[in-house]
Amino acid sequence: MRLAFEGEAESSDNEKLLLTAAVPASFEAIAAGYDVPELAKYLDYINVMTYDFHGQWETRVGHNSPLFPLNSASSFQKKLTVDYSAKEWVRQGAPLEKLIIGMPVYGRTFTLSDPAKFDIGAEAEGGGEAGRYTGESGFLSYYEICDFLHQDNTTLVWDNEQQVPFAYRGDQWVGFDDERSLRTKVAWLKTEGFGGIMIWSVDLDDFRGYCGTGKYPLTKAMVKELDGYNVDLKYQGPYETPRGGAAQKKEKKLCRNDEGQVSFHRDKNDCKKYFVCQGEHEHHKSCPDGLVFNEDEGVCDWPSAVEACSHLVGE
């Protein structure tokens, strides 16, 4: 498949399609079903689903996506965290910069056996009540969690060990991620050097602004925390040469101008940057703060004037 993607890019003169996979966070699943070094040779990105570590299928409450473990947790439970799972993929042979960390914008809920016992590990009788819109026991979208938090007699707790919040009211309990926990996870990701984030899923964020902090507050918090973060793709794997001994495709050259000719081209990976070609010489430039590059006009412009960059309006 990798060769097919490369061949399609060469024949069409388009950018190569990305070959990615969503993979489990469970250390047991990794060991049982994945040849990690072989996967890493061919995949552009490896999306690690670092969530659903705990849920209504268990008899004790646990957080959906803890960054770190409780000090009191068993050796097995300490492996059910974002930190451990992401690093397990590295230990098994995945390059740091190819690993994309899953960020949930939903919560897992439980019905407590005893409302007076609500800490992590408390006994549960099953999933919590179904959400008004998602309609699934044991699961709430972030905008449904906001409704839960707004109701009287709800207690919100920040778990300093796991670096995530949970809340309870009566016999209902929900573990989830908020702006604080997701910013913390992104900061951790940057420190460790992972490739980036993937969100599950954008439609579960507060897309109407019901929670009171604007539309898509969780997504925006992560994007803001990631601003300016870059990683170098240090390892791309020993890709095979097409049958027949054909030479490996050369990197497409952006600047093909005649000597003395100047042209401007947008950076397809960053609206705020562009390339200046002087003959065959390439220069990477940045627009002033608040502006993006308008390739049609060859100038830095307001985001509202560039359709592909309109999502940056107001930032």
Which residues does each predicted region cover?
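Conserved beta-strand elements of beta-rich interaction domains across eukaryotes
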Residues: 24-26, 53, 106, 181, ...
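Acidic-and-aromatic substrate-binding clefts and catalytic sites of carbohydrate-active enzymes
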Residues: 25-30, 176, 205-206
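Well-ordered beta-strand positions
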Residues: 44-45, 196, 273
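Disulfide-rich extracellular ectodomains of metazoan secreted and cell-surface proteins
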Residues: 185, 193, 200-203, 246, ...
